[in-house]
């Protein structure tokens, strides 16, 4: 039995924005060599949704960084812990226009994250590490973390017409 989720991730409320069937569901272990599996699955999905190459790269970079953070900080480097990734198509109306996007949900059962200790470090500080949150927040329109019981949930959202992250173009809108 899957330790994180059965059919619907625990702690996730059903909303009108989400259908019961996800476009993509991945279950993997917290081994860094599996990051390429996530990247390999997301790239054609983002292309299928019609995201431009720039958006595609930004989304994959953010998810890759988020999953790396789960492996390093939530699971403290343990290589056999479960991580689940769910992707779903989104749509919203803004200024009379329909914007299409993607929602990516990441679930793990690792240590809770103290969000008060997560401010991104100043970019002018020259030292390795600490840019992960900056990359994630700069690439995505919405970044939401929630702890529900023993489950961590990270919700990442990107819309095609977003100016955040400097990615994409009008022709890169999902169809």
Predicted regions and their residues:
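Conserved short strand/loop->alpha-helix "switch" segment adjacent to the catalytic nucleotide/phosphoryl-transfer site
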Residues: 40-64, 125-127
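Heptad-repeat coiled-coil signal-transmission/dimerization helices
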Residues: 35, 39-42, 136
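Conserved beta-strand-loop-beta-strand hairpin that lines the nucleotide-binding pocket
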Residues: 2-25, 71-175
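Structural signature of the histidine kinase catalytic ATP-binding subdomain
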Residues: 30, 51-54, 78
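STAS-typified acidic loop motif
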Residues: 23-37
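Hydrophobic residues in the alpha-helical elements that line and stabilize the ATP-binding pocket
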Residues: 66, 70
């Amino acid at each position: 039995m899957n330790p994180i989720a059965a059919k619907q991730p625990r702690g996730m409320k059903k909303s009108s924005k989400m259908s019961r069937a996800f476009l993509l569901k991945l279950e993997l272990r917290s081994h860094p060599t599996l990051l390429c599996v996530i990247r390999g699955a997301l790239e054609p999905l983002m292309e299928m949704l019609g995201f431009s190459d720039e958006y595609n790269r930004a989304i994959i970079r953010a998810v890759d960084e988020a999953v790396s953070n789960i492996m390093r900080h939530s699971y403290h480097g343990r290589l056999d812990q479960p991580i689940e990734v769910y992707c779903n198509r989104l749509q919203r109306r803004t200024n009379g226009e329909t914007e299409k996007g993607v929602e990516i949900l990441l679930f793990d059962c690792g240590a809770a994250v103290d969000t008060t200790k997560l401010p991104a470090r100043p970019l002018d500080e020259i030292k390795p590490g600490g840019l992960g949150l900056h990359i994630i927040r700069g690439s995505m329109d919405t970044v939401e973390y929630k702890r529900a019981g023993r489950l961590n949930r990270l919700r990442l959202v990107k819309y095609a017409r977003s100016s955040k992250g400097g990615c994409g173009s009008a022709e890169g809108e999902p169809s």
